[in-house]
Amino acid sequence: MSTWLLPENIADVLPSEARKIEELRRRLLDRFRSYGYEMVMPPLLEYLESLLTSGGADLRLRTFKLVDQLSGRTLGLRADITPQVARIDAHLLNRQGVTRLCYAGHVMHTRPRGLHATREQIQIGAEIYGHAGLEADLEIQQLMLDALHLAGLSRIRLDLGHAGVLAALLARDAQAAERGESLYDALSGKDVPLLNELTDDLGADTRAALRALPNLYGDASVLAEARTRLPVLPEITRALDDLAQLASQAKGVEVAIDLADLRGYAYHSGAMFSAYIDGVPNAIARGGRYDHVGQAYGRSRPATGFSLDLRELARISPVEARGTAILAPWAQDDALGAAVAALRDAGEVVIQALPGHDHVLDEFACDRSLVERNGAWVVEPR
């Protein structure tokens, strides 16, 4: 085997892509900070049981596992940063009020999520802990859309769903609850024949409501239809009210409602949102409410947040990260050294061409030169 080969769906990030990823990372983290979010940096490696407190079987399958040579315990390479941030909020910070946290870091997946998807993503996201009201979901939704606009994306479609609708239907019918996982699979896949089979012997109200869900999709007007076709339960009424407010506050984007879109249902406890753009089949950002995420760490708090993959964002973002630079000669000259240092202190990129390599400058557009004029070093256009 060649020593330069990498595992399948693992790739190096070369300078041009890395520069774009870093540009977007800085933009997004600066924007998160402007909203009051504090950055945390959880470790890449943790005890397996700490990483798998939520997310179900899917997260377990996506997590790389290895044995700790010091303790003999099983470790995991994180596949999702959200449980780690929940641990930090619940166990380390232990604050009583609202906490806003953000992060950016690598996650590893045992299997790619698509044919050409990477197994090493750079996950960036933001989360609010400590507020159960819809105001937190509205802020997270706004921040997610703000981040995508900051990355230069336009014509965004926001898909909204709510875990509370199915949860309310299952809670009122024990027989349906026993088939919860199968019903979830049928609804998520819009498998109407399977859904009909699973609901044949259920109560009439539950059967009609579950069979209605795959047809309750479209723009925000579908919520009015949902109010007539679903049982009048407090949880369902609240879920539909939440979706109406989220849709009304999503300014400048297309909004779609899908009450059968339950991806992440086992993880979420309330509103769920995903962002799409034309030409990209998968969601570029996902978020929602997951109030139970900190329970395994001994402190369950209301929580809502979103995340996205920076590598995928960089692939589709029109943001240009090719920087301009100043080309300077290489010489042991104190005045030249002082001039170069002053320019770098001012934020300029100054590349000193090493002897014999004056024209090997592929990655930066050197649009200016540092030249000596009348005993002084000055910057001139090239």
Swiss-Prot record:
On assembly, the entry states: Heteromultimer composed of HisG and HisZ subunits.
The organism of origin for this protein: Burkholderia cenocepacia (strain HI2424)
SUPFAM superfamilies referenced in this protein's UniProt entry, alphabetically: Class II aaRS and biotin synthetases
Alphabetized, the UniProt keywords read: Amino-acid biosynthesis, Cytoplasm, Histidine biosynthesis
Mainly resides where?
cytoplasm
Q: Output the GO biological process annotations, alphabetical, semicolon-separated.
A: histidyl-tRNA aminoacylation; L-histidine biosynthetic process
What biological function has been recorded for the protein in this entry? Required for the first step of histidine biosynthesis. May allow the feedback regulation of ATP phosphoribosyltransferase activity by histidine.
Recorded hits in HAMAP family, A to Z, give: HisZ
Q: What else is known?
A: This function is generally fulfilled by the C-terminal part of HisG, which is missing in some bacteria such as this one.
The record's section on InterPro entries has: aa-tRNA-synth_II/BPL/LPL (IPR045864), HisRS-like_core (IPR041715), HisRS/HisZ (IPR004516), HisZ (IPR004517)
The places in or outside the cell where this protein is found are: Cytoplasm
**Name of this chain's protein:** ATP phosphoribosyltransferase regulatory subunit
Provide the Gene Ontology terms for cellular component.
cytoplasm
One annotated GO molecular function is: histidine-tRNA ligase activity
Q: In which pathway does it act?
A: Amino-acid biosynthesis; L-histidine biosynthesis; L-histidine from 5-phospho-alpha-D-ribose 1-diphosphate: step 1/9
What family does this chain come from, according to its entry? Answer: Belongs to the class-II aminoacyl-tRNA synthetase family. HisZ subfamily.
